[in-house]
Amino acid sequence: MKKRNITEFQVLSEIIRKQPHIKQKEIAENLGITVQAVSEHIRNLVKEGYVKSRGRGEYVVTEKGLRKLKNWISEFKDYLDEINTAVYRYKDIWPAIADEDVKDGETVYLFMKNGLLYASKQPKGEAKAKALYGGKKGEDIAICEIKGIIDVPKGKVIVFRIPPEVVGGSRAVDFNLIKENIDNLDDYVIATMGTVAYVVACKLGLKPDIRFAVPEAIVNACNRGCNVIALITGKMAEKVIKKLDNAKISYTVLDATKENK
Protein backbone atom coordinates (compact mmCIF):
# COMPACT_ATOMS: atom_id res chain seq x y z
CA MET A 1 0.00 0.00 0.00
CA LYS A 2 1.17 3.51 -0.80
CA LYS A 3 1.61 6.00 2.04
CA ARG A 4 -1.36 8.07 0.83
CA ASN A 5 -3.57 4.97 0.69
CA ILE A 6 -2.56 4.05 4.23
CA THR A 7 -3.55 7.50 5.51
CA GLU A 8 -6.87 7.39 3.65
CA PHE A 9 -7.45 3.92 5.08
CA GLN A 10 -6.91 5.38 8.56
CA VAL A 11 -9.24 8.32 7.90
CA LEU A 12 -11.92 6.01 6.50
CA SER A 13 -11.53 3.76 9.55
CA GLU A 14 -12.00 6.76 11.87
CA ILE A 15 -15.13 7.80 9.98
CA ILE A 16 -16.74 4.34 10.19
CA ARG A 17 -15.97 4.25 13.92
CA LYS A 18 -17.55 7.63 14.66
CA GLN A 19 -20.10 8.25 11.89
CA PRO A 20 -22.16 10.24 11.29
CA HIS A 21 -20.82 13.00 13.56
CA ILE A 22 -17.22 13.52 12.53
CA LYS A 23 -14.81 15.94 14.14
CA GLN A 24 -11.89 16.52 11.80
CA LYS A 25 -9.76 17.94 14.62
CA GLU A 26 -10.20 14.77 16.65
CA ILE A 27 -9.26 12.59 13.66
CA ALA A 28 -6.19 14.77 13.04
CA GLU A 29 -5.07 14.35 16.66
CA ASN A 30 -5.61 10.58 16.58
CA LEU A 31 -3.62 10.16 13.36
CA GLY A 32 -0.95 12.75 14.04
CA ILE A 33 -1.69 14.80 10.93
CA THR A 34 -3.07 18.29 10.31
CA VAL A 35 -6.76 19.18 10.12
CA GLN A 36 -6.11 20.40 6.56
CA ALA A 37 -4.77 16.95 5.64
CA VAL A 38 -7.85 15.27 7.12
CA SER A 39 -10.11 17.64 5.17
CA GLU A 40 -8.27 16.86 1.93
CA HIS A 41 -8.51 13.10 2.46
CA ILE A 42 -12.23 13.34 3.25
CA ARG A 43 -12.80 15.33 0.03
CA ASN A 44 -11.01 12.60 -1.92
CA LEU A 45 -13.03 9.89 -0.20
CA VAL A 46 -16.27 11.73 -1.05
CA LYS A 47 -15.10 12.23 -4.64
CA GLU A 48 -14.34 8.51 -5.00
CA GLY A 49 -17.77 7.64 -3.60
CA TYR A 50 -16.41 5.93 -0.49
CA VAL A 51 -17.93 8.50 1.87
CA LYS A 52 -21.18 10.49 1.63
CA SER A 53 -21.59 13.95 3.16
CA ARG A 54 -24.84 14.83 4.90
CA GLY A 55 -23.79 18.39 5.63
CA ARG A 56 -22.98 20.05 8.96
CA GLY A 57 -19.98 17.79 9.53
CA GLU A 58 -21.90 14.56 9.09
CA TYR A 59 -20.26 11.83 7.01
CA VAL A 60 -21.15 8.17 6.50
CA VAL A 61 -19.28 5.38 4.75
CA THR A 62 -21.06 4.11 1.63
CA GLU A 63 -21.37 0.47 0.53
CA LYS A 64 -18.59 1.16 -1.97
CA GLY A 65 -16.49 2.61 0.83
CA LEU A 66 -17.15 -0.41 3.02
CA ARG A 67 -15.98 -2.75 0.24
CA LYS A 68 -12.88 -0.61 -0.26
CA LEU A 69 -12.16 -0.63 3.46
CA LYS A 70 -12.41 -4.43 3.56
CA ASN A 71 -10.09 -4.62 0.55
CA TRP A 72 -7.58 -2.31 2.24
CA ILE A 73 -7.77 -4.37 5.44
CA SER A 74 -6.98 -7.49 3.43
CA GLU A 75 -4.05 -5.80 1.66
CA PHE A 76 -2.72 -4.39 4.91
CA LYS A 77 -3.00 -7.76 6.62
CA ASP A 78 -1.06 -9.42 3.78
CA TYR A 79 1.60 -6.72 4.06
CA LEU A 80 1.93 -7.21 7.82
CA ASP A 81 2.10 -10.99 7.35
CA GLU A 82 4.97 -10.55 4.90
CA ILE A 83 6.82 -8.31 7.34
CA ASN A 84 6.15 -10.71 10.20
CA THR A 85 7.44 -13.65 8.16
CA ALA A 86 10.56 -11.72 7.17
CA VAL A 87 11.27 -10.79 10.79
CA TYR A 88 10.99 -14.34 12.07
CA ARG A 89 12.86 -15.82 9.12
CA TYR A 90 15.69 -13.39 9.77
CA LYS A 91 15.70 -14.31 13.44
CA ASP A 92 15.65 -18.07 12.84
CA ILE A 93 18.04 -18.28 9.89
CA TRP A 94 21.78 -18.54 10.46
CA PRO A 95 24.65 -18.51 8.00
CA ALA A 96 27.13 -21.37 7.77
CA ILE A 97 29.86 -22.44 5.38
CA ALA A 98 29.19 -25.59 3.37
CA ASP A 99 31.86 -28.21 4.12
CA GLU A 100 30.63 -30.04 1.02
CA ASP A 101 27.89 -29.52 -1.58
CA VAL A 102 24.56 -29.13 0.23
CA LYS A 103 21.09 -29.12 -1.32
CA ASP A 104 18.02 -27.22 -0.13
CA GLY A 105 16.20 -29.10 2.62
CA GLU A 106 19.02 -31.49 3.51
CA THR A 107 19.96 -32.22 7.11
CA VAL A 108 23.42 -30.95 8.03
CA TYR A 109 25.65 -31.32 11.07
CA LEU A 110 27.27 -28.22 12.55
CA PHE A 111 30.80 -27.70 13.78
CA MET A 112 33.26 -24.87 14.34
CA LYS A 113 36.51 -24.48 12.39
CA ASN A 114 38.81 -21.47 12.56
CA GLY A 115 36.14 -19.62 14.50
CA LEU A 116 33.54 -20.08 11.76
CA LEU A 117 30.38 -22.20 11.66
CA TYR A 118 30.49 -25.04 9.12
CA ALA A 119 27.78 -27.41 7.93
CA SER A 120 28.42 -30.97 6.77
CA LYS A 121 26.21 -33.87 5.72
CA GLN A 122 28.55 -36.16 7.67
CA PRO A 123 27.98 -36.45 11.45
CA LYS A 124 30.34 -34.03 13.19
CA GLY A 125 28.67 -33.87 16.59
CA GLU A 126 25.21 -33.68 18.13
CA ALA A 127 24.25 -30.30 16.67
CA LYS A 128 22.30 -30.44 13.43
CA ALA A 129 20.06 -28.23 11.33
CA LYS A 130 18.10 -28.02 8.11
CA ALA A 131 19.58 -26.32 5.07
CA LEU A 132 17.02 -23.76 3.98
CA TYR A 133 19.18 -22.67 1.06
CA GLY A 134 22.04 -24.96 0.04
CA GLY A 135 25.19 -24.24 -1.92
CA LYS A 136 28.49 -25.54 -3.23
CA LYS A 137 31.41 -26.46 -1.00
CA GLY A 138 32.91 -23.32 0.52
CA GLU A 139 29.81 -21.18 -0.13
CA ASP A 140 27.63 -19.61 2.53
CA ILE A 141 24.34 -21.42 3.08
CA ALA A 142 21.25 -20.62 5.16
CA ILE A 143 20.39 -23.02 7.97
CA CYS A 144 17.37 -23.19 10.27
CA GLU A 145 15.75 -25.47 12.85
CA ILE A 146 19.00 -25.86 14.79
CA LYS A 147 18.94 -28.69 17.33
CA GLY A 148 21.57 -29.74 19.85
CA ILE A 149 24.65 -27.99 21.20
CA ILE A 150 27.51 -27.01 18.92
CA ASP A 151 30.76 -28.27 20.44
CA VAL A 152 33.24 -25.39 20.63
CA PRO A 153 36.43 -26.45 22.42
CA LYS A 154 38.54 -23.55 23.60
CA GLY A 155 41.58 -22.79 21.53
CA LYS A 156 45.12 -22.71 22.88
CA VAL A 157 47.70 -19.94 22.66
CA ILE A 158 51.43 -19.85 22.08
CA VAL A 159 52.79 -16.52 23.26
CA PHE A 160 56.14 -15.53 21.80
CA ARG A 161 57.89 -12.78 23.72
CA ILE A 162 59.42 -10.59 21.03
CA PRO A 163 62.42 -8.50 22.16
CA PRO A 164 61.71 -4.75 22.15
CA GLU A 165 63.78 -2.33 20.10
CA VAL A 166 65.99 -1.39 23.07
CA VAL A 167 67.48 -4.91 23.05
CA GLY A 168 67.68 -5.36 19.30
CA GLY A 169 64.09 -5.66 18.08
CA SER A 170 63.59 -8.01 15.13
CA ARG A 171 67.37 -8.31 14.73
CA ALA A 172 67.48 -10.19 18.03
CA VAL A 173 64.66 -12.63 17.22
CA ASP A 174 65.14 -16.40 16.96
CA PHE A 175 63.06 -16.91 13.81
CA ASN A 176 63.76 -20.66 13.72
CA LEU A 177 62.15 -21.09 17.14
CA ILE A 178 58.96 -19.43 15.92
CA LYS A 179 58.90 -21.39 12.64
CA GLU A 180 59.36 -24.74 14.39
CA ASN A 181 56.41 -24.15 16.72
CA ILE A 182 54.15 -22.79 14.00
CA ASP A 183 54.82 -25.87 11.85
CA ASN A 184 53.39 -28.05 14.63
CA LEU A 185 49.96 -26.42 14.33
CA ASP A 186 47.46 -27.02 11.54
CA ASP A 187 45.07 -24.13 12.05
CA TYR A 188 45.83 -20.93 13.89
CA VAL A 189 45.14 -17.23 14.06
CA ILE A 190 48.05 -14.78 14.09
CA ALA A 191 48.05 -11.95 16.64
CA THR A 192 50.69 -9.23 16.92
CA MET A 193 51.10 -6.57 19.58
CA GLY A 194 53.65 -3.83 19.14
CA THR A 195 55.58 -2.59 16.11
CA VAL A 196 58.47 -5.04 16.42
CA ALA A 197 56.10 -8.01 16.65
CA TYR A 198 54.33 -6.85 13.48
CA VAL A 199 57.66 -6.60 11.63
CA VAL A 200 58.61 -10.10 12.80
CA ALA A 201 55.31 -11.48 11.47
CA CYS A 202 55.94 -9.84 8.10
CA LYS A 203 59.47 -11.29 7.93
CA LEU A 204 58.00 -14.73 8.57
CA GLY A 205 55.48 -14.21 5.78
CA LEU A 206 52.59 -14.19 8.23
CA LYS A 207 49.59 -11.91 7.86
CA PRO A 208 48.30 -10.82 11.29
CA ASP A 209 44.60 -11.51 11.87
CA ILE A 210 44.60 -9.57 15.15
CA ARG A 211 46.33 -6.22 15.65
CA PHE A 212 43.95 -4.13 17.75
CA ALA A 213 42.49 -4.77 21.23
CA VAL A 214 44.83 -7.75 21.13
CA PRO A 215 44.32 -9.36 24.59
CA GLU A 216 40.53 -9.24 24.26
CA ALA A 217 40.60 -10.40 20.64
CA ILE A 218 42.81 -13.38 21.49
CA VAL A 219 40.34 -14.48 24.17
CA ASN A 220 37.42 -14.07 21.75
CA ALA A 221 39.23 -16.14 19.12
CA CYS A 222 39.95 -18.93 21.62
CA ASN A 223 36.33 -18.95 22.79
CA ARG A 224 35.34 -19.58 19.17
CA GLY A 225 37.65 -22.57 18.94
CA CYS A 226 40.70 -20.93 17.32
CA ASN A 227 44.30 -21.65 18.25
CA VAL A 228 46.36 -18.47 18.39
CA ILE A 229 50.00 -17.67 17.65
CA ALA A 230 50.65 -14.45 19.56
CA LEU A 231 53.75 -12.40 18.77
CA ILE A 232 53.89 -9.90 21.63
CA THR A 233 56.54 -7.23 22.06
CA GLY A 234 58.38 -6.99 25.39
CA LYS A 235 56.40 -6.32 28.56
CA MET A 236 53.13 -6.20 26.63
CA ALA A 237 53.12 -9.99 27.01
CA GLU A 238 52.23 -9.62 30.70
CA LYS A 239 48.95 -7.95 29.80
CA VAL A 240 48.07 -10.76 27.40
CA ILE A 241 49.01 -13.47 29.91
CA LYS A 242 46.86 -11.87 32.62
CA LYS A 243 43.89 -11.81 30.26
CA LEU A 244 44.40 -15.48 29.37
CA ASP A 245 44.60 -16.44 33.04
CA ASN A 246 41.35 -14.62 33.81
CA ALA A 247 39.63 -16.36 30.90
CA LYS A 248 41.06 -19.77 31.93
CA ILE A 249 42.62 -20.31 28.51
CA SER A 250 45.55 -22.69 28.11
CA TYR A 251 48.77 -21.11 26.87
CA THR A 252 52.51 -21.58 26.46
CA VAL A 253 55.02 -18.74 26.72
CA LEU A 254 58.25 -18.89 24.71
CA ASP A 255 61.03 -16.33 24.70
CA ALA A 256 61.83 -15.57 21.06
CA THR A 257 65.06 -13.74 21.85
CA LYS A 258 68.06 -15.13 20.01
CA GLU A 259 70.71 -16.62 22.28
CA ASN A 260 74.08 -14.89 22.19
CA LYS A 261 76.89 -17.18 21.17
From Swiss-Prot:
This protein's name: Uncharacterized protein MJ0558
One of the Pfam families matching this protein, by short name: DUF7839
InterPro entries: DUF7839 (IPR057161), HTH_CRP (IPR012318), UCP_HTH_arc (IPR012015), WH-like_DNA-bd_sf (IPR036388), WH_DNA-bd_sf (IPR036390)
Any one GO BP annotation for this protein: regulation of DNA-templated transcription
An example Gene Ontology molecular-function term: DNA binding
